[in-house]
Design a protein with these regions (language model features):
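Ankyrin-repeat-protein effector appendages
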Residues: 2-54, 206, 239, 272, ...
């Protein structure tokens, strides 16, 4: 029986070798014979890539017995998969604390070992939301200041995924609440982006800058407006966020809200002291952007709060001009109802009617004509709206303008006869 076991063991190895050996090893195996190859195998134990995958899968599943068997078979505890994850990375992400402790006791894995994205096991534990594993790794010397390839700390990952308990553990170990990643986002930005209100409160209670660092891009409040996080907007304003902080292209949170068309968020911003007369990098007011986006409710609310109907941007365009850009007939009606100049000229002498004719926007063109727009006005290039429609090949627009001009001339002739 004692002689049969080694032979059975060798046959098992031969079966695996037939699949796993490279061409060079096959040549050695054929030339030297079974006996010499057996000695060669014993002198230099090898493990296969398949064994590494088994180790990582066992760590992912939290199977202690399989991990022990793989390590006893000679698979290194610090071997990496195609993403650079070790068994500790896998176990930490899944929160298998006993397994993490066991692998760390082997002494083969550094607690701050990095994968191919420069993430440590602590990063992965925080990403997976495992406070107990996070606590253990921190006690073992894991750095809460370690940065991933994108500049994110473990706290960034915990807050981005809404893991309140894990974020609390990091802050209890004095992790900074205000680090910025390579996109200039702090953990507060990520919590706001994900809509994790409890995490936002935790960060603010532990000293997070409500502005996210001034002058470094978008503020948390602007980000909350951009993603439509009404609760986040309300909370940040309550905690002292400046509604008039400028972000990319000089835009404030009110500009961004005007683009998104969220009336409820707009109401919060106005109550929080947002100014209507601040211009962005294109000298556009919030009303300009609301007119372009076409949100009738937002346009109405801005007008009722005193937004200027005849404000001009860097091209001397009024909010009414902006409604022509996307055929926003309802917004145009509202602006005209409150007294916007239907024949206002921009820098090149074009009226809103010129812009509607250029883009082929039939609905808003009808609104302009119904409100008395003059089709005979010429731009700086001496073109009427009819000339523009003909140049840009909009036959429907051209036909409507010609019909309107005929009616207008008929009315003028009738008045002259009287």
């Amino acid at each position: 029986m004692s002689r049969a076991c080694p032979e059975l063991h060798w046959r098992w190895l031969e079966l695996h070798d037939s699949v796993s050996m490279g061409s060079r090893e096959r040549r050695v195996r054929t030339a030297t014979g079974t006996r010499q190859w057996r000695i060669h195998r014993r002198a230099k134990p090898r493990y296969s890539v398949l064994d590494e995958r088994r180790l990582h899968y066992a760590a992912w599943e939290g199977c202690m017995e399989h991990v022990k068997a793989m390590l006893e078979h000679g698979v290194p505890a610090n071997c990496q998969d195609s993403y650079g994850w070790t068994a500790v990375h896998h176990a930490s992400f899944k929160g298998h604390l006993p397994l993490v402790k066991f692998i760390m006791q082997t002494g083969q894995v550094e607690v701050n070992s990095q994968d191919f994205f420069n993430c440590t096991p602590l990063h992965r534990s925080c990403s997976g939301g495992n406070p107990d594993t996070t606590e253990f790794l921190l006690q073992k010397g894991a750095s809460h200041e370690a940065r991933s390839r994108s500049g994110q700390t473990p706290l960034h990952l915990a807050t981005a995924n809404g893991h309140l308990g894990t974020a609390r553990v990091l802050l209890q170990h004095l992790a900074s609440p205000n680090p910025q990643d390579f996109h200039k986002w702090t953990p507060l930005h990520w919590a706001v982006f994900g809509g994790w209100g409890d995490v936002v409160e935790l960060l603010l209670d532990n000293g997070a800058d409500v502005e996210g660092g001034r002058g470094v891009g978008m503020s948390p409040l602007q980000l909350a407006v951009l993603v439509g996080n009404e609760a986040g907007v309300r909370l940040l304003l309550h905690r002292g966020a400046d509604a008039n902080t400028r972000g990319p292209n000089g835009q404030t949170a009110l500009h961004m809200c005007a683009c998104s068309g969220d009336k409820k968020i707009l109401q919060h911003l106005l109550k929080g002291g947002a100014k209507l007369d601040i211009r962005d990098g294109d000298i556009a007011s919030p009303l300009h952007l609301a007119a372009r986006s076409g949100s009738r409710a937002v346009v109405h609310l801005l007008i009722l709060n005193g937004a200027g109907l005849e404000d001009r941007d860097n091209l001397k365009m009024t909010p009414l001009h902006y409604t022509m850009l996307r055929d926003n007939a309802e917004a145009a009606k509202l602006l005209l109802h409150y007294g916007a100049d239907v024949n206002a000229r921009e820098r090149l002498g074009q009226t809103p009617l010129h812009l509607a004719s250029e883009r082929g926007h039939l609905k808003v063109l009808k609104v302009l004509l119904d409100k008395g727009a003059n089709p005979f006005v010429r731009s700086s290039w001496r073109e009427t709206a009819e000339d523009v429609a003909r140049t840009h090949n909009h036959p429907c627009i051209l036909q409507l303008l010609q019909q309107h001009q005929m009616l207008r001339r008929r009315d003028q002739d009738a008045k002259e006869r009287e």
